[in-house]
From Swiss-Prot:
Example of a GO biological process term: DNA replication
Originating organism: Bovine herpesvirus 1.1 (strain Cooper)
This protein's name: Ribonucleoside-diphosphate reductase small subunit
Gene3D superfamilies noted in UniProt: Ribonucleotide Reductase, subunit A
Active site: Y110
Quaternary data: Heterotetramer composed of a homodimer of the large subunit (R1) and a homodimer of the small subunit (R2). Larger multisubunit protein complex are also active, composed of (R1)n(R2)n.
Gene: RIR2
CDD domains from the UniProt entry: RNRR2
Any one Gene Ontology molecular-function term assigned to this protein's record: ribonucleoside-diphosphate reductase activity, thioredoxin disulfide as acceptor
Swiss-Prot/TrEMBL keywords: DNA replication, Host membrane, Iron, Membrane, Metal-binding, Oxidoreductase, Transmembrane, Transmembrane helix, Viral latency, Viral reactivation from latency
Cofactor(s) required, per the database record: Fe cation
Function, as annotated: Ribonucleoside-diphosphate reductase holoenzyme provides the precursors necessary for viral DNA synthesis. Allows virus growth in non-dividing cells, as well as reactivation from latency in infected hosts. Catalyzes the biosynthesis of deoxyribonucleotides from the corresponding ribonucleotides.
GO cellular component: host cell membrane; membrane
Highest taxon listed in the record's lineage: Viruses
Amino acid sequence: MAEAADAATLTRKYKYFYETECPDLDHLRSLSVANRWLETEFPLADDAKDVARLSGAELEFYRFLFAFLSAADDLVNVNLGDLSELFTQKDILHYYIEQESIEVVHSRVYSAIQLLLFRNDAVARAGYVEGALGDPAVRRKVDWLERRVAAAESVAEKYVLMILIEGIFFSSSFAAIAYLRTHNLFVVTCQTNDLISRDEAVHTAASCCIFDNYLGGERPPPARIYELFREAWKLSASLFGCAPRGSHILDVEAISAYVEYSADRLLAAIQLPPLFGTPPPGTDFPLALMTAEKHTNFFERRSTNYTGTVINDL
């Protein structure tokens, strides 16, 4: 087991060459590299025609949702830099470099979709996003994260928070976007959503892996972990209090059940019993499960209706 990651970690002897020290993280990095993609490969402008097909309440909800995702993605990027500095194992450092690279793509995709939802009115988009970040549902999540990170008594607790951001906060949003596909809306946006959700599955798996194997056995008490999971679940549910009532697109109940299932799956990944006991979603659930377990190539389900060329498409 590796030494605990703390301020003293960086004082260990640094190796000026590469050798495999963390084969599990090396595998996840290789999986991510093999499935790199760029925002320029997807003609998001093709979805512009669908903006008018949303009701006023649905359009407001998806504008709000993408404002939240963009803000949350930036918070993850800030935390990545802090976490990567805690380790000297090059497999972990290389993995985080790869994750930061794909997070840039996610950020650019979210920005393009936001602009699409405002019919390319950049001024309106900027004003809306600034206001949305002050919305109580978003503010509670951001404040909770900042407060919990500041109060975290250990690196292990910070990793629990990362697992919750990537595995709980994001998963409900990805599911809400995936429901657009069931009505043949925003087809290209849904393609990018599939890829982003798969990327985040790898990122969550990496956080669980580091938590389990590279923190020197340091773990918060189970009661503390369950407390954080309950809080994250409650906050995720509150965000969907903004969902339009009577929408023919969204199934909020199914999304809520999916979040509970995701929480139980993440608890299993860090060697803890389930909290909710919720079964996996049915085959009619529109989002491919956020899991990296099959280690398949992410592009196997990818449509060819985009610009650019996929190289090394296994």
